[in-house]
Amino acid sequence: FVGSNNELTSQYSVRGGSYDENLIYVNDFEVFRPYLVRSGQQEGLSFINPEMVKGISFYNGGFQAKYGDKLSSVLDIQYKKPKKFGGSAYVSILEQGLQVEGVNKNSKFSYLLGVRNRSNRNLLSRQDTKGNYVPSSADFQALLNYQFSPKWQAELLSNISQTKFTLIPEFSQLTTSVFSPLYSATIGVDIYFEGREKDRYQTNMLGFSLINQPSKKLKLKWMASRFENDEAENVDIIGTYLFGDRDFDKRNPTYGLIVNPLGAGVYQNWARNELNIENWNVSHKGNYDKG
């Protein structure tokens, strides 16, 4: 079973596992997502650019040892190797993107470039918590390949991504109904906010691989990569709330208001989180096809 609990997120769980138990590879390089993200509204673009993808392999268990020791799943992405000049572009309310690919005259050098920009402000503004949402996310990816000879080639994969999220909440109105043989009521909570949240997530990735294919059956690949996450969260929000019975009789002038207060209070959400991760990896992979 593969599922997600939020339509705003690219996180997914497999067979009840956590999202961080899933491995993701792009052209044999392991990629990571921001670590401090706590909700879908903070997320930006996922690492994978669909316009650059050639093939996808997904294993929800029982995968080969070459993929490592994570518990739940493996998502193995292979990007395209262009054979001619081309490209694509798309524009939507939430996201815009441009992809360009091509080769040189002797077909030894190929490039695959992609740039995306996303803002889901229109979607977030329809949530229960009303306020000023300012999300933005952009990334640039490049895959460069050079064929030295029929047996040797080099590949460079790079990604630069930045996501910013600012929220100045104003008001939230929540309602739930309680039914029982002894008591039934419509309980509401009105929350008034002051303060703001400001987050930033910067991701940089650079991977280099040298590929040697001595024969049709044997393929050797040396890889080196660097992955960096620079994240910061700044939250200082005070909420004043009132809860009680909400009036849903449209004939009354108090329609939609709390008419029988049961309690009130104040809470504060405060955070100063910073995280910087730098991951270097050097590896070698070999593949021999007996067929």
Regions found by a protein language model. Give the residues of each.
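Periplasmic N-terminal accessory/gating domains of Gram-negative outer-membrane beta-barrel systems
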Residues: F1-F63, V74, K80
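Short sequence motifs at beta-strands and strand-loop junctions characteristic
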Residues: S4-N6, Y67, Y90-S92, N132-S136, ...
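Membrane-embedded beta-strand positions in outer-membrane beta-barrel channels/transporters
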Residues: Q11, G55, N60, S72-D76, ...
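Outer-envelope exported proteins of Gram-negative bacteria
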Residues: R15, L112, E155-S161, K219-N229, ...
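Extracytoplasmic loops and strand-loop junctions of Gram-negative outer membrane beta-barrel proteins
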Residues: V37-Q41, F58-Y59, K80-K83, L124-D128, ...
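Short strand-turn segments of transmembrane beta-barrel domains in outer membranes
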Residues: Q42-S46, K54-Q64, S73-G102, S110-V115, ...
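Transmembrane beta-barrel wall of Gram-negative outer-membrane proteins
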Residues: L94-N117, K130-E170, E197-W222
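Flexible loop and strand-edge segments within Gram-negative outer membrane beta-barrel domains
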Residues: N120, Q153-A154, S158-Q213, E228-N252, ...
